[in-house]
Amino acid sequence: IEADGIIIGSPTYFSNISTEAKALIDRAGLVSRMNGDLFKRKAGAAVLAARRGGAVPAFSAVNYFFLIGQMIVPGSTYWNLGYGMDPGEVEKDEEGIKTMKDLGVNMAWLLKKVKN
């Protein structure tokens, strides 16, 4: 795996990630595990969109994948969530946008540290 870091994003459906994101995690996790832990010591961050509730369990689902795969998860100023129902509404979530920007700064910092 050439990437030094991975960001997985998903909408929140019924307090969990989308079926597509779950399939990616399940398949990539198995392939990684069966081939010597391909994601070990790489950076990973979860980014979720939610209408209202249920985003924290979805956020956890992605982070469990990273942590079980021995990945390094950078923090931010809050959970990496954006709130909105219709397309474009998440962009109006000022706290969510700030959290994402802070995550980007922290991810870039971590990638530089891990690379060296």
Regions picked out by a protein language model, each given a short descriptive name:
Residues I1-E2, I72-N116:
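Glycine-rich phosphate/pyrophosphate-binding loop and the adjoining helix
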Residues I1-I72, T77-Y78:
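Helix-loop-strand module that forms the ligand-binding subsite of alpha/beta enzymes
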